[in-house]
A protein has these predicted regions:
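TPR-repeat structural position
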Residues: 137, 181, 225-227, 278, ...
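Conserved alpha-helical positions within TPR/SEL1-like repeat arrays
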Residues: 166-177, 206-223, 256-274, 300-318, ...
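Helix N-cap/loop-to-helix boundary motif
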Residues: 134, 158-162, 199-209, 226-228, ...
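C-terminal boundary/linker of central alpha/beta nucleotide-binding cores
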Residues: 11-103, 107-122
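Extended alpha-helical scaffolding segments used for macromolecular assembly and cargo binding
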Residues: 20-21, 28, 111-190, 194
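Amphipathic helix/helix-loop-helix segment enriched in hydrophobic residues with interspersed Lys/Arg
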Residues: 1-2, 43
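Amphipathic alpha-helical segments of tetratricopeptide repeats
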Residues: 148-149, 192-200, 235-250, 286-297, ...
């Protein structure tokens, strides 16, 4: 209490000198990221900050901001590329503490902050990915995270509805595309909680289906056990999507609503492919493709066909139908590149997944070219410890290992594990990379170091699985192969596999 009183004393005189409109604006800003509030965000749609402030009265907004800057309640960022403001964190805390004592004002300010942010951010359309919106999402993502924190940390509950949940769902989608899973999952979990609280028993809503879908896919990276839960969640998503379409009058479903159902079928099918249930995977991917063909073609729905071809390619790869898998992977990459351009993250993902099939076909140099291209794109767009970059480096190191270029292989494999558990790289992926490096070190007779990495990798699997390896493995080399296959199968299929049904026609090292 003494701390709160001290903070209030610092700012009270200045706050009391503000007119009501300017104070309302400051309360809204308190829910946003204090380090960088874009002025473009404030000049959004009419009536988003108070009853009198509108985009048509830009001059009035300028006057209010000037007043706040003059009183040192805000300051301009001079280092940012676009006009933005900064608020002292102690002032932000004071404003939020004051709002916690004024429930009606707090709710109004929060709703307006949500509306400002929602209006500034383009809605994520799963029909395609529009690359021109990426910069906008990246610029304003801190505001979404600030709203999430304010909502969760408020002393009193804040009401939130579908608009905020939809914003969280879209943010989760963007973060997943950038493989920022640790940030995305709490956002989506909060969105799910908000939507469920709004729905009556038996009710469905598209926002809930979207959130469930993203949570299922995100959780699939963590462990085999989580992928089993993801399969159950995706079955619910299919039911939700089918229920939404059934509830609509005939021929009134939008293109996106129908595509959302196809996505749900496809994502569930992909999890079946991950667990090597290829018959179910084949049925689900075919069902989604048939739906897309009824809605458009490769020209009108290029992105969705690209995604679908890549999913079917993974199934064909696992079925041993390599010629089909290679053709589908190539078409997937080309469609994605023509839709989004060669430097988009989704294009890079299609290129990496194409490389998995090339490895299975024994075209190691072709795979290496694809992986190097994708690494260049990902390194340009993502941080060094991003799991997409680390996974690409694992595969580059693995291809070099297959080519007996051990020095290059070691370099990339060490880079793949250098951040360890501190990155978003899933535990199964880290263990696989550690064991691949151990195999390389064993080849070089660097026993002590090899054992260290081998033990680290084996610590990620259960005693029962380790016992199975030693029972089935007749001889040291056989045990190494079985261990690599066990660790490889624990990795989510989207991150690639090179053993079991996904070994393909390649011969030589496991």
């Amino acid at each position: 209490m003494q701390y709160e009183r001290t903070l209030s004393t610092v700012w009270d005189d200045l706050l009391e000198s503000l007119d009501s409109e300017t104070r309302d604006l400051l309360d809204v800003l308190a829910f946003l990221n204090p380090d960088c509030i874009s002025e473009d965000l404030l000049r959004g749609k009419p009536d988003t900050t108070s009853g009198n402030l509108t985009v048509n009265n830009s001059f009035r907004l300028t006057v209010m901001l000037s007043s706040l800057i003059r009183r040192n309640l805000l300051e301009r960022n001079i280092t940012t590329t676009c006009p933005s403001l900064r608020m002292h964190r102690l002032l932000q805390l004071t404003l939020l503490l004051n709002l916690d004592r004024r429930q009606e004002k707090r709710q109004e300010a929060f709703d307006n902050a949500v509306r400002l942010t929602r209006d500034a951010l383009p809605r994520r359309d799963m029909t395609s990915r529009l690359p021109q919106f990426d910069a906008i999402w990246k610029q304003h993502m801190p505001q979404v995270l600030s709203l999430q924190a304010a909502f969760e940390q408020s002393n009193l509950s804040i009401a939130a509805g579908f608009e905020f949940a939809s914003l969280l769902a879209d943010a989760g989608s963007f973060l997943w595309e950038h493989r920022l899973n640790r940030i995305a999952i709490p956002l989506l979990t909060l969105g799910e909680k908000i939507v469920v609280a709004q729905l009556q028993e038996g009710e469905t809503h598209s926002v809930l289906a979207s959130i469930e879908n993203f949570l299922a896919v995100l959780s699939a990276y963590d462990s085999v056990e989580d992928r089993r839960l993801a399969m159950q969640r995706l079955k619910r998503v299919v039911q939700l999507r089918e229920g939404i379409l059934r509830s609509l009058p005939d021929k009134t479903a939008t293109l996106e609503q129908q595509i959302d159902l196809g996505r749900a079928w496809n994502d569930l099918a992909y999890i079946h492919a991950d667990t090597e249930e290829f018959e179910e995977a084949d049925q689900g991917t075919a069902k989604a493709l048939e739906l897309y063909k009824s809605l458009g073609d490769e020209r009108s729905l290029r992105f969705r066909f690209a995604i679908q071809y890549q999913s079917i390619a993974a199934v064909r790869f696992g079925q041993g139908r390599l010629t089909e898998a290679l053709d589908l992977s190539r078409r997937s990459y080309e469609l994605c590149k023509s839709e989004l351009g060669p430097r988009h993250l989704e294009t890079a993902r299609m290129e990496v997944e194409w490389s998995y099939v090339l490895i299975g076909a024994g075209d190691l140099h072709g795979a290496l070219d694809r992986l190097m291209d994708a690494l260049a794109v990902r390194s340009e767009r993502l941080e060094r410890d991003n799991p997409a970059i680390l996974n690409t480096k694992y595969w580059i190191g693995t291809v070099y290992h297959y080519l007996d270029q051990l020095e290059e292989a070691e370099e990339y494999l060490r880079q793949a594990i250098e951040f360890g558990a501190d990155s978003d790289l899933g535990k199964p992926d880290l263990a696989r990379s550690q064991y691949r490096l151990a195999l390389l070190l064993y080849e070089q007779r660097r026993w002590k170091e090899a054992v260290t990495f081998e033990e680290a990798a084996l610590s990620s699997i259960s005693d029962e699985e380790q016992a199975t390896i030693f029972c089935d493995g007749d001889g040291r080399d056989k045990r190494k192969d079985i261990t690599m296959e066990v660790l490889d199968r624990r990795v989510f299929l989207q991150n690639g596999r090179s053993t079991g049904p996904f070994r393909g026609e390649r011969t030589g090292k496991v």
